[in-house]
Amino acid sequence: MPIYGDGYRNLNSHFHFHFQFRLNNFFRFIVHGQIKIMGSEVEVVEEIAFPKQIVGTTTKPLSLLGHGITDIEIHFLQIKLTAIGVYLEPAIVEHLQQWKGKPAKDLEEDDDFFDAIVSAPVEKVIRVVVIKEIKGSQYGVQLESAVRDRLAADDKYEEEEEAQLEKIVEFFQSIYLKTHSVLNFHFHFPPAARTPVAQIEFSSEGKEDAKMKVENGNVVEMIKKWYLGGSRGVSQATISSLANNLAIELSK
């Protein structure tokens, strides 16, 4: 039996404590708002634990079907910005039967496939955990710009969309996204609603939770496309993960 000595044991203990702190912190965040964890299995993304299943507005479980990061490269140095987890109802596969049996690589390169994910009438949660701290106002401007450009490209940018985006920018101006802060983008169909709504929930250690509702259907759609939009998605690692996991689900 190999002997590593006290140095190894101390390092291992430190890692276990550090990881357990993040795990407990994450679970504390995820029970805020309408979202609750389900079970104890997790997927670790950049030392951040994402539960394999959560429960949203209904008793239906949502499964972690995609995960990844956003990052930038400066002078050949990778800077990781956020970790992402995408939760979908298992019923999503019923709306993707056209792609049944297709390999993951084909799905990853097919924007129509991701458009079908975006438009499928199932509950979705996109969970974003901050790695590199950033002002909320900076994040809000990035989101607003990406959504506005997509709306304009589809000729859907009118006064109602502009007003909704202004409210989103105001919401993010009121928060600070320090490391381990959490944003939930929760998409669902309220009873009798014709279009989905989104709720943005913010949690951060030592700060009061904040949330806002997004009711403009066009803006809701483009927020989803920012994260789930195939080749135009903000995180290609997440897109690849979604393609791999959904290819497995569609092969069953």
PLM region descriptions:
Residues 26-205, 209-252:
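Terminal leader/tail segments of proteins
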